[in-house]
């Protein structure tokens, strides 16, 4: 099953932001049965860099910065071999790690 993950924030009459990815629900390779059953995980399908130019890292937790950096590392790892020239340069620039 494919799910849309769409966290967003909208200020009425002002502005809004939404970051959206499509993800496939996948079974864990070696599931550990718990009192709640076994779990699934999300495999990201839409591997698109998140535009970080308006992110203020002073307002972000270390965990949030780490999540963006891990996501961008995965986007680059999977897409860089498929790109060349200007597209590759753009991908590398847009997946640079965030720093404080």
Where in the sequence are the language-model features?
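Charged, cofactor-coupling segments
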Residues: 1-100
């Amino acid at each position: 099953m494919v799910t849309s993950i769409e966290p967003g924030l909208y200020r009425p009459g002002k502005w809004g932001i939404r970051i959206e990815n499509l993800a496939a629900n996948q079974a864990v390779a070696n599931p550990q049965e718990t009192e709640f059953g076994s779990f699934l995980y999300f495999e990201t399908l839409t591997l698109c860099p998140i535009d970080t130019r308006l992110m203020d890292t002073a307002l972000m937790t270390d965990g949030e910065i780490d999540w963006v950096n891990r996501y961008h590392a995965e986007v680059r790892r999977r897409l860089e071999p498929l790109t060349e020239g200007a597209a590759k340069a753009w991908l590398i620039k847009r997946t640079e790690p965030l720093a404080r």
